[in-house]
Amino acid sequence: MSSKKRSFGDIEFGESDEVGGTNVDVNGEDDFENDDEVESFEDDEQSFEEIEEGGEEGGDNDGEDKGPKKVWRAGVDPLEEDEVLDYDSTAYDMMHSMSVEWPCLSFHPIKDELGAQRNKYPHTMYLVAGTQADEAKNNKVIIMKAKQLHKTKHDDEDSDDDEDSDDDEESDDEDDEDKDVDPELQLAFINHNGAVNRIRSMDQQSNIVATWSDNRSVYIWNIANHLKALDNETVAPKQTAPLHTISNHSIEGYALDWSPKIAGRLATGDCNNSIFVTNASESTWKTDTQAFKGHTESVEDIQWSPSEEKVFASCSIDQTVRIWDIRKPKPAITVKAHTADVNVISWSRNVEYLLVSGCDDGSFRVWDLRAFKDNSPVSDFKYHTGPITSIEWNPYEESQVIVSSSDDQVTIWDFSLEEDTEEFTNANANPDDDFQYPPQLFFIHQGQHDIKEVHWHPQIPHVAISTSIDGFNIFKSSNSEE
C-alpha cells in the first residue's frame, strides 16, 4: 500500500456524514445522518454525537409497510440522488460517534483500572490517537476519555412504545439507569512533531505509548499525567517531551507493535524494508543497531507472537508474511501470502497458531502457522471491494475477526458459522441477482468514509472502535454474545 493510500484524501474536514450497520443474520443495512452534537470538553471543535433517530427521508412514511428490509451493498448497489440509507437502532446494542479537530490515521484503546469483561452500561473508555493535520506543526497525540456511553438500542422508539414495555425493558433499565444522560468526551493533547502514522500503547503499562511519525522518527511517551488530568478534569501540559526517540530508521514507516510477553520490547518497520527492535532497560531505551532485513519492499505491519517472546511476524508490499526470531537477522519463514500488497496482519492471542492477513486487493486470509507455506491459507475471503486497512482478532471470541476496508465498511466475521440452513440462504439472498453474503459474515457497519483502523476494546467485550476521516465510531452489534 503506497503512502498516498495510507493518508487521508483531499476531503474537506468538518462535513457531517452517515453511520449505520447491518446485523446480517437478522436485519437489513441501516444508515442515517448525524445531527445532534453532545457536550464537548475543552475545545468546541471536538464533539460527541449520540446516534439517535433515523434519517428523515429513509424512514417509514405514515406507517406505510414497505416490505422486508434489503441490505445495501457498498460498491455493488447504486444509491440514487434521492435515496438515503435507513438507520435502525435495533442493529446495535450501542452506537456512538465522536469527532475531533483533525482526522486520525491511527488510535489504540488504553487498558484501564475499571475492570475486565465489564458489560454493564453506561461504559467509560480511554483511547489514544494521533492526528494527520493540515500542517506538520498542528499535529498532536490526543488522549481521550469517553464516558456515559449508554445503550442506544431502541432509541428511535416513540415514548408511547416505552409505556407499553414489559419486564424485559425494566430489566434493561436496571443495567442502564443513566441511558438518557448525554455521553461526554474529554480530551488532553501532546504536541507531536509530524503526522502520526501509527500509535500503540504498551500492554503491560498502558500509559507508555509509541508513535510512528512521518518525519522518520519513532517517539515513546508517558501519558500518565494526561490520563490523570482527564480523571481530575484539569489541563495537562501540551508541551511534553518524549521519553525516548528512535532515530535508526532512514525513512518513515507504519509497522509498530509492543511485545505482549516482554514489557518495553518494541518492533518498528519502515518503508525502506528495515525492522528494528527496541528494548527498555532500568534507566533508558536501547535499539539494536543491526536491522532485520528480508523484505524487498515496505514493511506494512508487525505482530509479536502471543506465546514466544523472541518471535514476531511481519508483512510487506512484497506480498509476503515473514516469521522472525530476534536472535537471527534473517527471517525464519517466508511465505507468499497474497498476490498484492499485504497491508495488515493480526496474530491471535487465543489460538496461538492462527494468523490473519489483509491484502490490498480486498481479500483477507486465515493461516495455520503449524502448516505455514505458500498459497495454503485455511480460509480465503474476497468480500471487500477496496484494500483492507485494518484487521484484528476478537479477544473475547476466538473465532471472530473485525476488518476495515477502504470500501467504507467495517465487517465482523465468525469462522464458526456455516451455511447449513435454508433459512439463512433465504434471509440474505437478493431477489434481483445471485449475490449472497458469505455465511461467516456476522455484521456490517457502514457510514464512515476512508476508514483507516478498527480495534476491539480489550476490557469491554464485543465493543469495537473505528477511525476514519469523519471521526470515530464506538459500537456493539446487537447479535454479539454477552
From Swiss-Prot:
UniProt keyword Nucleus, yes or no: yes
Superkingdom of source: Eukaryota
Name of the protein in question: Glutamate-rich WD repeat-containing protein 1
Principal cellular location given in the protein's record: nucleus
Disulfide cross-links: none
Span list, region Disordered: 1-75, 148-180
Compositionally biased spans, kind Acidic residues: 27-63, 157-180
SUPFAM superfamilies in alphabetical order: WD40 repeat-like
Gene3D superfamilies reported for this sequence: YVTN repeat-like/Quinoprotein amine dehydrogenase
Compartment list: Nucleus, Nucleolus
Organism of provenance: Dictyostelium discoideum
GO terms (BP aspect): ribosome biogenesis
One cellular component (GO) term of this entry: nucleolus
UniProt KW DNA damage keyword: no
Spans of repeat WD: 191-231, 294-334, 337-377, 383-423, 446-482
Keywords attached to this entry: Nucleus, Repeat, WD repeat
